[in-house]
């Protein structure tokens, strides 16, 4: 039984921080923020306006506004369309004017992402706001919202568990059916069918849904993205199986590996180092450790084994509600909106532990899994082993 999400409590967390920052209203444009507050799947450009007190208002395409309203916890949903009086920003400005906020302090979501368009406020939208309200003060709310989102509540953690369980199930079905001669897209379809049957709402990633890479496509240098193709899987290939599920808008991300037939000595050596590195990474994700410390420990291990050049220099990323919450990446660097090496792991954070170890001409292996940070260590939400499966079919 899933824990019931407390959307009132979520709203109050945001409004409390708005009060501390002196923000009168927050314009939330990120898909993840809209989902966190309203609880509905909003595939379109949706913008929520959150007042410092009272319920939020969501503006979304009119062709989907009734469905979104039905699925949302808060029912204040307004349909928009490119028609006089119905345009999104025309209606948002009207909402703010009615509340006397022409000279107010307005929060917006500014920033960028290294991996995808995170639906931050667009430059053109920012210009509309500044031109309409030249005396208003606009504050970037992205940082304090990220601080709220990074600590998960009970309902979020339960949804992560369900998404992880669905990914584990999908992997199990794939490993039972995987055989030489299948195409990568066929394998992706097997995974997708199994996970949809188990309740997954979306193969959420923009990297090809269920990522399947085989042979040379599994071992691109630093290659961490394998959208499936019509390539046929051959004997001797290693195969990356990177599966994605969604449950109550919360995401599952599981990557494991298979080898078609008896591994070569070089494949076995890489596999042994890969498995040892996976275990070290999992052991390193514990409260009190910084992202930079975890990355340094992994880099040192890769140096000792002589495989540093083949390891993607990032050992995990955030995960959350639809929109991904990818920030921050587990690296010992600090680039605004991308990485934060001094960030400390805390209980109730959920991190994707990730390892990409690719040696072109030999094999490439990938591990991803959701990990809950606990007060004493961590809990892997995916339960499947790190060792590559040997497939003799």
Model-derived regions, located:
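Active-site neighborhoods and metal-handling regions in enzymes and metal-associated proteins
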Residues: 1-393
